[in-house]
């Protein structure tokens, strides 16, 4: 069954896209949740009428994504973590950890937009890709540091303030 997306849906596409999905998925999930409508002549006419406003909306979102990319591309996110004696982290740095660290810097993104091959489980410097919009991606630097003593915590605060001032 072909459906027209009424809003962006991560696994299928973006608002206004026509997608082919299984009948049950469309009838039982997408349509009842108002994510999509069935592709038919009436809905195609509606889509054609809405195309201009969709283009304006997409252009606005892309511009906002470019502005956000400019803000975050130079940021180094310092994440303090507890470390075992063998150098491994207690726990790991996940997408949500990165989103929380960015929120402290007043940058709001969705955790689904943070792309990592696997969670970070050791100290060091890493690079993580953030998908901001269709073709607008930004790479941010993640620095995982040891929060063993007060000296390490002070170092983290100094680096965070330096990154915010930059």
From Swiss-Prot:
GO CC terms: ribonucleoprotein complex; ribosome
Keyword rRNA-binding among record annotations: yes
InterPro entries with a match to the protein in the record: Ribosomal_bL9, Ribosomal_bL9/RNase_H1_N, Ribosomal_bL9_bac/chp, Ribosomal_bL9_C, Ribosomal_bL9_C_sf, Ribosomal_bL9_N, Ribosomal_bL9_N_sf
Gene3D superfamilies, A to Z: Ribosomal protein L9, C-terminal domain, Ribosomal protein L9, N-terminal domain
A biological process term (GO) from this entry: translation
Keywords: Ribonucleoprotein, Ribosomal protein, RNA-binding, rRNA-binding
Function: Binds to the 23S rRNA.
Protein known as: Large ribosomal subunit protein bL9
